[in-house]
């Protein structure tokens, strides 16, 4: 699903690589943590996957496509294969929960009836079916994050990227969020969780890639998840 082949990224007006010789593969349906301190290169790696940046050297493949070779008009189609969950939720305050979840599907060719069925299914999945007509300001942080998950999944993505998904919610809600993402992975969807919360990573014992100063310093399989490097 994701392939980085000896990828280096150097930004303009910088002599220091943001990423250097990054090489890894993520299978379809795999659940992977990406960890590292601020400045380790996590954000740059995500930008390469999303094709917001291009590699200086090497190749980035997403779902079999070389992102650097994609024509600009094809980039939106690549991104529609992804569901993004942001730390700050990014819900539209003037839309209800239902409307927020349905929003991304309106730009596709999905019919109104199918959208309704899909949104209702997603809200049941995240246990928010009774909040469909509520506006974001009346939701707790954990509820807003679950709406963000439902929205990310609504258009049936092949890849879900969660960027610090527990950063703005309490520890109990963080555990619920990770359990929800595990259920997403069990649906055959590739899940990449970017986080700096090492205790959470150890608890869920999944494959963990650790970045430090732009390089991968460890890539630990799930069965040995407790050995995460900091």
What are these regions (language model features)?
Residues 1, 9-21, 71:
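A short, flexible loop at the N-terminus of ABC-type nucleotide-binding domains that lies
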Residues 50:
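Helix-to-loop junction immediately C-terminal to a conserved catalytic motif
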Residues 58-66:
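Conserved ABC transporter NBD signature motif
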Residues 95-103:
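Short coil-to-helix segment of the ABC ATPase nucleotide-binding domain corresponding to the Q-loop/switch region
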Residues 135-139, 143-145:
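Conserved ABC ATPase signature
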Residues 154-158:
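A short, proline-enriched helix->beta-strand linker immediately N-terminal to the Walker B motif
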Residues 160-163:
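Catalytic Walker B motif of ABC-type/P-loop ATPase nucleotide-binding domains
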């Amino acid at each position: 699903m994701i392939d980085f082949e000896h990828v280096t990224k150097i930004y303009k007006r910088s002599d220091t690589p943001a990423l250097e010789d990054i090489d890894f593969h993520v299978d379809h349906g795999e659940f992977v943590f990406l960890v590292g301190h601020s400045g380790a290169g996590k954000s740059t790696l995500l930008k390469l996957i999303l094709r917001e940046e291009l590699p200086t050297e090497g190749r980035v493949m997403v779902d079999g496509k070389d992102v650097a070779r994609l024509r600009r008009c094809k980039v939106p189609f690549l991104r529609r294969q992804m569901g993004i969950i942001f730390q700050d939720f990014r819900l539209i305050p003037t839309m209800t929960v239902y409307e927020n979840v349905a929003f991304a599907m309106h730009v596709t060719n999905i019919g109104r009836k199918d959208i309704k069925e899909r949104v209702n299914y997603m809200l049941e999945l995240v246990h928010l079916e009774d909040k469909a007509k509520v506006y974001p300001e009346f939701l707790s942080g954990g509820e807003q994050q679950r709406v963000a998950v439902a929205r990310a999944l609504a258009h049936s993505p092949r890849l879900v990227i969660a960027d610090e998904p527990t950063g703005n919610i309490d520890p109990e809600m963080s555990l619920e969020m990770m359990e929800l993402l595990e259920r997403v992975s069990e649906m055959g969807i590739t899940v990449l969780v970017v986080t700096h919360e090492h205790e959470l990573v150890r608890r869920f014992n999944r494959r963990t890639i650790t970045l430090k100063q732009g390089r991968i310093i460890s890539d630990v399989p799930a069965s040995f998840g407790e050995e995460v490097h900091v």
